[in-house]
């Protein structure tokens, strides 16, 4: 079931919420159990065959967590370490089978010539997210962070539908206290208003913006051929904005849905294209995945404790595996490795500036504009590998982006040029093919309209900042002028966005991160 579907918005969600608050008047535990069962129904709407897998995964990790906690309390460190290794290994084997078996079967098939079995393993929806969430739980138990082991609360923690399909990746210690609080189970009209506002802003981002710009991105990646400069950049930028508003929309909708139930999720998306460098980008993009990779992979590899060279190697390996987490394919591996190189160069540059006695935090306005622009271009280049179906296709698009395939302006647009301008462009090798003029205009109109939005406009969490919309939305932020309040003006704005979002449900599409 999709957040951006009629059956969810007008069926599942209102029923789940009304029954939850109705049951909660008599029993908080029964209400939590209802929400867990409703979440399983939500998951099963996609494919009921994988509901037992989700339940078995939750039961296995819960039992392992109980035994692990006993070993930790008894200070049986060797037994605790062995159980942790076994449980994490079992989770990774499960994830590896469903997510990577087809990839390795494909490699074997290309080597051996035997293609049997390739593509027959279907990836269960959300398996990467609920697996990583539970690995984090096991690690937190081992470290002594987990204090509560109620089985119903744990089941809700794993299956909780606002995060189940595409994140955020949760920590047990940040969710369990909320499931225990009495106020979570009381209907709060302010929380409902805030939650629905965030949800419908997210719906607008997904159905109007992301799905609206998608047709101007997909053709390039489905059949790249030898795109010219304008076609290559147009498609790459269109996808850059499609992915941004798709993931931003999903993140808003997840936070908004959860807020209706009185539960705050961690912030997972924070205007990443405003980043001045790649380090900052990964503090803003898929923030809970970045947190997981840092806490449970980068630090486990040694972090920055074993010298500069080892630190850079750890960064690169972490991002390489982060790319592999996104998908079983060489394009994802290359994307992760490229971001690993970006981070190594970024850290090296900052270290060099410090050695030269410069303060990396101090920069001019022009320097900030340049830093943001070069970071954005680097991200766009990396997205080409992320979206392309093969490395050859990605390289073909990049060749077009650097102008190796020439530049073409549709003949219909060339009619607006003066004869001297057209002659000059023709001299420089520009071609003027027939057709495609209106499409190119619309494509670049989207790009011109969306670029200032992602670079300058406040995001949803900032607009609702005074209400602390997410767990890690820190207090030190300066409130923006465009700040939401329960006023008639804001009601009209949100109603307009809601109407546009709902009217666009005729072209329902999955969120891009559902495939991971």
Residue ranges and their predicted role:
Residues 1-515:
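Membrane-embedded transmembrane alpha-helical bundles that form the catalytic cores
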């Amino acid at each position: 079931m999709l957040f951006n579907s009629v059956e969810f918005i007008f069926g599942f969600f209102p029923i789940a919420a009304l029954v939850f608050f109705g049951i909660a008047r008599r029993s908080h535990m029964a209400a939590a159990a209802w929400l867990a069962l409703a979440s399983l129904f939500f998951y099963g709407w996609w494919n009921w065959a994988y509901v037992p897998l989700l339940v078995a995964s939750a039961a296995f990790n819960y039992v392992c967590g109980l035994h692990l906690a006993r070993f930790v309390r008894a200070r049986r460190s060797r037994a605790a370490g062995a159980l942790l290794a076994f449980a994490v290994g079992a989770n990774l084997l499960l994830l590896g089978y469903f997510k990577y078996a087809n990839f390795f079967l494909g490699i074997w098939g290309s080597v051996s010539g035997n293609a049997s079995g390739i593509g027959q393993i279907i990836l269960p929806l959300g398996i990467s997210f609920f697996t990583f969430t539970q690995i984090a739980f096991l690690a937190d138990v081992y470290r002594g962070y987990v204090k509560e082991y109620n089985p119903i609360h744990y089941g809700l923690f794993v299956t909780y539908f606002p995060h189940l399909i595409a994140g955020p990746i949760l920590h047990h210690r940040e969710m369990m206290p909320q499931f225990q609080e009495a106020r979570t189970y009381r209907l709060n009209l302010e929380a409902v208003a805030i939650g629905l506002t965030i949800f419908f802003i997210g719906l607008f981002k997904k159905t109007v913006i992301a799905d609206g710009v998608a047709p101007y991105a997909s053709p390039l990646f489905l059949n790249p051929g030898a795109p010219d400069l304008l076609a290559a950049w147009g498609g790459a930028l269109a996808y850059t904005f499609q992915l941004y508003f798709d993931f931003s929309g999903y993140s808003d909708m997840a936070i908004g849905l959860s807020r209706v139930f009185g539960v705050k999720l961690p912030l997972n998306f924070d205007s990443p294209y405003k980043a001045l460098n790649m380090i900052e980008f990964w503090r803003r993009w898929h923030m809970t995945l970045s947190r997981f990779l840092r806490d449970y992979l980068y630090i486990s590899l040694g972090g920055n404790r074993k010298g500069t060279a080892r630190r850079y190697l750890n960064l690169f390996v972490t991002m390489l595996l982060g790319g592999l987490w996104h998908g079983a394919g060489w394009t994802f591996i290359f994307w992760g490795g490229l971001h690993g190189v970006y981070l190594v160069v970024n850290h090296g540059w900052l270290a060099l500036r410090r050695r030269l006695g410069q303060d990396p935090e101090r920069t001019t306005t022009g320097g900030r504009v340049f830093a943001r622009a070069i970071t954005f271009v680097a991200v766009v280049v990396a997205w080409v590998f992320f979206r392309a179906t093969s490395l050859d296709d990605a390289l073909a698009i990049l060749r077009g982006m650097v102008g190796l395939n020439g530049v073409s302006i549709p003949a219909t647009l060339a009619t607006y040029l003066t004869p001297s301008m057209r002659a000059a462009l023709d001299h420089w090798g520009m071609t003027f093919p027939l057709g495609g003029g209106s499409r190119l205009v619309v494509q670049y109109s989207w790009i011109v309209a969306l670029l200032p939005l992602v670079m300058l406009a406040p995001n949803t969490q900032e607009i609702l900042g005074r209400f602390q919309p997410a767990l890690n939305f820190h207090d030190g932020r300066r409130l923006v002028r465009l700040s939401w309040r329960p006023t008639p003006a804001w009601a009209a704005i949100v109603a307009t966005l809601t109407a546009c979002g709902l009217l666009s449900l005729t072209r329902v599409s999955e969120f891009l991160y559902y495939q991971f």
